Regions:
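The feature encodes the CheY-like receiver
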Residues: 57-58, 81, 85
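Acidic catalytic/metal-coordinating carboxylates
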Residues: 33-37, 60-63
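Active-site residues of response regulator receiver
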Residues: 10, 53, 81
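Two-component/phosphorelay signaling modules centered on CheY-like receiver
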Residues: 13-30
Length: 132
């Protein structure tokens, strides 16, 4: 059985490891700690869902979101942020983010959002399949 692919993009190893622990049983998990690595992983792995930190070194999560959506528009991106910023939320939503989740995050809430995002990608794939 092929597990759905999940990409975790965060510059903090402890966050990536925690999220990998949470999601490794139901997902094929990939990690990236930078914009360059994230873009390469999206091209290579074609994840269904990306968990993306908003604050990244040398760039911000909004720029990473832009590039992910350009490469793989069907991918659902959940932004992780320690900031409570309405302007950021609006911009992320306008660029196609599925959701914003505050740090520290509630694992149950994050799992629910990832499952909802996965359901959306599955529904989009069914719609995209040609009828025979």
């Amino acid at each position: 059985m092929n597990l759905p692919r999940l990409l975790i993009v965060d510059d903090e190893m402890s966050v990536r490891e925690s999220l990998k622990f949470v999601f490794s049983k139901g997902f094929s998990v990939f990690e990236a700690n930078s914009l360059e690595t994230a873009v390469a992983k999206v091209k290579e792995a074609r994840p269904a869902v990306v968990l993306l930190d908003v604050l990244m070194p040398r760039t911000d999560g909004i720029e990473v979101l832009r590039q992910i959506k350009a490469i793989h528009p069907g991918c659902e991106v959940i932004m992780l942020t320690a900031m409570n910023n309405r302007q950021l939320a609006a911009k992320a939503t306008d660029l196609g983010a599925f959701a914003l989740v505050g740090k520290p995050f509630d694992v149950v809430d994050l799992l629910a959002k990832v499952n909802s995002a996965l359901a959306k990608t599955a529904a989009q794939e069914k719609v995209a399949l040609p009828q025979t």
